[in-house]
């Protein structure tokens, strides 16, 4: 199983899904589901240089062509696609840290099925977004931060924050 993760830099809100592979099809499906789930407008997305996101290292020019399936999906959704510099994972540090937390959970548990893994990840995601305060957010949870942002800058949002999966206070 492969985990795709998106984190809003301003509020630390997380969206994630597991897939059977790291294909272009999986990455574009993830992008479309992210766009549908996110309460805020998505202007820019930052990804690593995996072949599911870019042709940067498979094209002869060694630069992205802009014609990769993921680039075209971003374009169709009005999202600007940025790539991390090669061999510089700290650029995407929020996702790297979150993935470390997920690795800890996965490595401490034996799952009887993929469905059980998905259920555990879904429960953790809900807990993370709704209940875990973040120091960078002045000890608010990501959902609390989203609600604050929405009250101050409603033009950045496409739907109500309280329609998120999990607990709603």
Q: Can you annotate each of these PLM segments?
A:
Residues 72, 77-79, 100-169:
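C-terminal domain-tail junction helix/linker
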Residues 38-62, 85-87, 92, 138-143:
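Acidic/histidine-rich, metal-coordinating catalytic segments
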Residues 21, 59-61, 114:
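A generic secondary-structure micro-motif detector
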């Amino acid at each position: 199983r492969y985990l795709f993760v998106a984190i809003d830099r301003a509020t630390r809100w997380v969206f994630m899904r597991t897939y059977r592979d790291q294909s272009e099809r999986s990455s574009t499906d993830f992008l479309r589901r992210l766009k549908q789930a996110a309460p805020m407008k998505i202007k820019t997305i930052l990804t690593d240089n995996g072949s599911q996101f870019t042709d940067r290292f498979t094209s002869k020019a060694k630069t992205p062509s802009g014609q990769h399936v993921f680039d075209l999906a971003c374009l169709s959704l009005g999202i600007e696609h940025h790539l991390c510099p090669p061999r510089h994972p700290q650029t995407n540090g929020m996702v790297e840290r979150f993935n470390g937390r997920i690795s800890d959970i996965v490595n401490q548990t034996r799952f009887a099925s993929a469905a059980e893994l998905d259920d555990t990840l879904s429960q953790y995601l809900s807990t993370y977004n709704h209940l875990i305060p973040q120091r960078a957010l002045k000890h608010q949870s990501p959902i609390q931060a989203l609600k604050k942002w929405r009250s101050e800058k409603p033009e950045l949002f496409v739907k109500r924050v309280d329609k998120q999966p999990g607990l709603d206070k």
